[in-house]
Amino acid sequence: MFTLKKSMLLLFFLGTINLSLCEEERDADEEERRDNPDESEVEVEKRFLPLLAGLAANFLPKIFCKITRKC
């Protein structure tokens, strides 16, 4: 029973350390994002362009069909 408690305590301790390291890294990443607004603009462009390409792929054939009347 004592070894089980010791093992559980060790796992809890290691998990707590791991969690605190992850939080520190996440905080550092958030500070970098606040310091560099250009990166956030690039992320927005990356999200926007695939959406725009998908919409164009759906609507361009329909528009072309209506213009040329060759459906």
Curated annotation (Swiss-Prot):
Signal peptide: 1-22
Name the record gives this protein: Brevinin-1E
Organism of this sequence: Pelophylax lessonae (Pool frog)
Disulfide bonds: C65-C71
Gene Ontology annotations of biological process type: defense response to Gram-negative bacterium; defense response to Gram-positive bacterium; hemolysis in another organism
Tissue-by-tissue expression: Expressed by the skin glands.
Pfam families reported for this sequence: Antimicrobial_1, FSAP_sig_propep
Coiled coil: none
Family in the record: Belongs to the frog skin active peptide (FSAP) family. Brevinin subfamily.
Keywords noted in UniProt: Amphibian defense peptide, Antibiotic, Antimicrobial, Cleavage on pair of basic residues, Cytolysis, Disulfide bond, Hemolysis, Secreted, Signal
Organism phylogeny: Eukaryota, Metazoa, Chordata, Craniata, Vertebrata
